[in-house]
Design a protein with these regions (language model features):
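Histidine-anchored nucleotide/phosphate-binding helix
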Residues: 64-68
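Well-ordered mid-protein domain cores that form the structural environment of catalytic cofactors
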Residues: 105-127, 131, 135-148, 152
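Bacterial Sec-dependent N-terminal signal peptides
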Residues: 1-32, 583-584
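Signature for the C-terminal beta-barrel architecture of outer-membrane proteins
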Residues: 24-30, 36, 41-61, 71, ...
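Long, ordered, helix-rich scaffold segments
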Residues: 539-549, 554-556, 570
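Structural motif
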Residues: 72, 107-109, 259, 544
Length: 584
C-alpha cells in the first residue's frame, strides 16, 4: 500500500507542471499495458508424496501481475502490480501478498534521460551489473533509486545509477541489504572520429564500475588455549572478529568489433575481496572473462562463446543464498543452450559462480532447395556443443582461528586455468525439414552429461554423473492454412538418476483461436516400480484478439527450470492450472 501511495504522490509531483503548462495530460498521451494471471488448484497424489500437509493445507495458488505504461512526448511513467495469493508451488513463500513492487517516472530531453523509481539496467554483458526480471523463474532484482543516461557528443554514452534491490516485499533498512552504485561509459569510435565514419569495421569500447555498500553483520570466533603457571593449568579464551568489508567494488572493460557478418565481443571483469555465504567467506578477489565470436552469411551461421569465472558471486547481502539466487548484482552469461523439448531440458545447467570454464559452439546451415539433400524447400541443420568444467584450484592452509578456509584467500588459481572436473556437456543436432505444403518436421539427437552433485548439491566430485541420450521427432501436418495437427515424440535413455523416459504429445490447432493438446511423460525406466509414473496432461486454449485463456489438468514432474543459467526448483504437483494473458 505504501508503494502505491509513494508512486501516486511522486507521479502527481512530476506531472503537475506539465499539466499546468499544457492543454491536458491526455493530449498526445498513450496508455498501454498487459496482464497475466496464473492460478492452480492442487489435488493430492500419494505416489508423488503430495498430501494436504506437504501443500501446507492450501488447495490453491495464484500468481498475477498487471503492467501499466503511460507515455506523453518525452515523459513516461509506469507501474506493475503483483499478487501472490498464495504463491504457486515452487515460488518462494516470501512473495505472499499484494502490492506494487515496481513503479517509475522517466523524462528525456535531448541527450539526457533520467529515471526515478524502479528500473532495470545492464552494463555490457552483465559481468558487474544486470538488473532483470523473469516471471516464470520468480526472479526480480530491480533497482529502486535513480538511473541517468547522458550523451555529451555523438558516440559517447555515460550512465550512472544508485539504488537498492528488490527483496520480495521487504522494505529497505540499513543492514538488511546494501546500496548499489554504478557508472558506465560507452564509446562508439566510428561516430566519435570522423575519419572512421565510413569504415566498414565498427569498433565500440566501454567500461564499468559498480560498488555496493552494506552494513555487514559482526562475525566473531572464540579460540580456547591452555597454559600453565606453577604447574597449574589455565584456560584462555581469545575472541577474534572477522573483518568484513562494508564496501565492495568491481570493474569491467569491454570491446565489440564488427565487420559485415563478423562480430567479436569480449569483456573482462574483476571484483575486490568479498567474503560471503556463496564463496565460504574467503577473501580472494573475483575475476571473469566472457568472449564471443559470430559469423553469418547466406545459408550459414557460426557462433562461438567462452567464459572463465572465478569467485564472481556479487550480491548486495553477503548472507544471501537460495534458488533462484536473489540479490545478485551481476549476471554471469549462460554458455549452454536452452532446449524447447521437455526431455532435452530435463537436465539443465546452472552457472557455478565459484569457478567455471565454459565453452559453446553452434553451426547453423541451410541446405539449398533444389539439391538432393535440400529437396524442394531446403533443409536447415543445427549442430551445437557446450561444455562446463572446473578451474584449477590449489587450496591454501586453513586458518588456525576458524579451523577452516574462512578468513583466508581460500585457494590459488592461474587465470584461464581449466580443471579436470566436468560439470556439464551437451552435444545436439537438429534437422528442420519441410516435405510439402502440408508436412514439416524436426528431428533431433542430444547427448548430455550432467554432474548432479555439482549442479544441484554444490558437492564438487563426479560421483553422481548422469549420462543421457535423447531423441526427438516432431511432425506437423497442416489440413488448411488455419488447421494443423502436431505429433511430438521424445525418448530419454540413461542408466543413472531416474532411468529412462518416453514422452508423447498430440496437439490440434485452429489458428488463431483454439488449441487442444494431450501429452504424457512416462518414467518407465525408474529403478523403483512405484515411481514408474505417467505424467499425463490435457490442455486447451482460446484466444480472442489480444486475450488468451489456457487450461491444463494433469501431473507436473519435479525438476529444475532454468533461464540463462539461473534456476528455480519446481516440485511435483497434480491438479488444474489456468493462465490468462491480455495486452492493451
Amino acid at each position: 500500500m505504501k508503494s502505491i501511495i509513494h508512486f501516486s504522490i511522486f507521479l502527481l509531483c512530476i506531472t503537475g507542471p506539465f499539466v499546468a503548462l499544457s492543454q491536458g495530460i491526455t493530449e498526445g498521451a498513450k496508455v498501454t499495458g498487459n496482464i497475466q494471471i496464473d492460478g492452480q488448484y492442487y489435488t493430492e497424489n500419494e505416489t508423488l508424496g503430495i498430501t494436504d500437509s506437504s501443500l501446507n493445507y492450501r488447495k490453491t495458488g495464484m500468481n498475477g501481475f498487471a503492467n501499466l505504461l503511460y507515455t506523453n512526448g518525452n515523459f513516461s511513467a509506469g507501474m506493475r502490480m503483483e499478487s501472490y495469493l498464495n504463491p504457486m508451488l515452487g515460488f518462494d513463500s516470501r512473495y505472499e501478498g499484494v502490492g506494487v513492487p515496481y513503479w517509475f517516472a522517466r523524462y528525456k530531453t535531448g541527450s539526457f534521460e533520467m529515471t526515478a523509481g524502479h528500473f532495470y539496467e545492464q552494463f555490457g554483458s552483465g559481468l558487474v551489473l544486470r538488473s532483470w526480471e523473469n516471471w516464470a523463474l520468480g526472479y526480480d532484482n530491480n533497482l529502486y533509486g535513480f538511473n541517468t543516461s547522458f550523451s555529451p557528443i555523438d558516440g559517447i554514452t555515460l550512465k550512472g545509477l544508485i539504488g537498492i534491490q528488490r527483496y520480495f516485499w521487504e522494505p529497505y533498512e540499513i543492514g538488511n541489504r546494501g546500496i548499489v552504485k554504478g557508472f558506465d561509459a560507452d564509446f562508439d569510435l566510428n561516430e566519435i572520429f570522423e575519419k572512421m565514419a565510413d569504415c566498414q569495421t565498427r569498433i565500440d569500447i566501454g567500461g564499468s564500475f559498480v560498488s555496493k555498500y552494506e552494513k555487514v553483520p559482526k562475525v566473531t570466533y572464540v579460540v580456547d588455549s591452555k597454559y600453565f603457571i606453577d604447574s597449574v593449568e589455565w584456560n584462555k579464551q581469545t575472541v577474534y572478529e572477522l573483518k568484513l568489508p562494508n564496501n565492495v567494488g568491481s570493474w569491467a572493460a569491454r570491446v565489440n568489433i564488427s565487420n559485415g557478418g563478423l562480430n567479436f565481443y569480449s569483456e573482462y571483469a574483476e571484483k575486490s575481496n568479498d567474503p560471503n555465504a556463496t564463496n565460504g567467506q574467503i577473501y580472494k578477489k573475483g575475476t571473469a572473462l566472457y568472449s564471443s565470436l559470430a559469423y553469418s552469411t547466406k545459408g550459414l551461421g557460426v557462433f562461438l562463446s567462452t567464459k572463465w569465472i572465478d569467485n564472481m558471486s556479487f550480491k548486495s547481502k553477503i548472507t544471501e543464498t537460495g534458488t533462484p539466487p536473489m540479490l545478485d548484482i551481476n549476471y554471469l552469461p549462460a554458455i549452454s543452450k536452452e532446449h524447447q523439448y521437455s526431455l532435452a531440458a530435463l537436465y539443465p545447467y546452472a552457472t557455478q559462480p565459484n569457478g567455471e570454464f565454459g565453452f559453446q559452439g553452434q553451426i547453423d546451415y541451410k541446405i539449398r532447395k533444389g539439391t538432393a539433400l535440400g529437396g524442394k524447400y531446403g533443409t536447415s541443420l543445427t549442430l551445437n556443443y557446450s561444455l562446463a568444467k572446473s578451474i584449477k584450484k590449489d587450496t591454501v592452509a586453513i586458518s588456525p582461528i576458524t579451523n577452516s578456509w574462512v578468513g583466508t584467500q581460500g585457494y590459488k588459481t592461474n587465470f584461464l586455468s581449466i580443471g579436470d572436473l566436468k560439470y556439464y556437456t551437451d552435444v545436439n543436432f537438429l534437422i528442420d525439414k519441410k516435405f510439402s505444403n502440408k508436412w514439416k518436421g524436426t528431428f533431433g539427437y542430444f547427448n548430455q552429461s550432467y554432474n548432479k552433485n555439482v549442479i544441484e548439491e554444490g558437492i564438487y566430485n563426479e560421483n553422481n554423473m548422469v549420462k543421457a541420450n535423447i531423441a526427438v521427432v516432431d511432425l506437423t501436418y497442416r489440413f488448411t492454412p488455419s488447421k494443423s495437427f502436431r505429433l511430438e515424440t521424445q525418448g530419454l535413455w540413461t542408466k543413472e538418476d531416474k532411468g529412462d523416459w518416453l514422452s508423447m504429445l498430440l496437439e490440434y490447432n485452429i489458428s488463431p483461436t483454439w488449441f487442444f493438446a494431450i501429452s504424457d511423460e512416462y518414467n518407465y525406466g525408474n529403478p523403483s516400480d512405484d515411481l514408474k509414473i505417467h505424467y499425463y496432461n490435457v490442455a486447451m486454449g482460446y484466444t480472442q484478439n489480444t486475450t488468451r485463456f489456457a487450461l491444463r489438468y494433469g501431473l507436473q514432474r519435479e525438476g529444475l527450470l532454468c533461464v540463462g543459467g539461473v534456476c528455480r526448483y519446481v516440485p511435483a504437483s497434480t491438479g488444474l492450472t489456468l493462465t490468462i494473458t491480455s495486452t492493451f
